[in-house]
């Protein structure tokens, strides 16, 4: 779980555009965030396995 202070700090508009970064909307993790879903890889995997993300299914080949 991310620190609440860092989550609040990230929500503010940065002084410079390059300082902006993505965070998982579910847990607040700053790394490995899928932009399309706004979720980190861990949360994405959990929700995908439960079938809570529409249009996403486990790949098999």
UniProtKB/Swiss-Prot annotation:
The keyword tRNA processing does not apply. Its cofactor is Zn(2+). The keyword Lyase does not apply. Keywords: Metal-binding, Ribonucleoprotein, Ribosomal protein, RNA-binding, rRNA-binding, Zinc. GO terms for biological process: translation. NCBIfam families: PRK08061.1 (NF005974). Belongs to the universal ribosomal protein uS14 family. Zinc-binding uS14 subfamily. PANTHER family: 30S RIBOSOMAL PROTEIN S14, SMALL RIBOSOMAL SUBUNIT PROTEIN US14B. This is Small ribosomal subunit protein uS14. It comes from Brevibacillus brevis (strain 47 / JCM 6285 / NBRC 100599). The lineage of its organism: Bacteria, Bacillati, Bacillota, Bacilli, Bacillales. The gene is rpsZ.
């Amino acid at each position: 779980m991310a620190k609440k202070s860092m989550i609040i700090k990230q929500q503010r508009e940065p002084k410079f555009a390059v300082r902006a970064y993505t965070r998982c909307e579910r847990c607040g993790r700053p790394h490995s965030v899928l932009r399309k879903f706004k979720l980190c890889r861990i949360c994405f995997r959990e929700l995908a396995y439960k079938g809570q993300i529409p249009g996403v299914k486990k790949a098999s080949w």
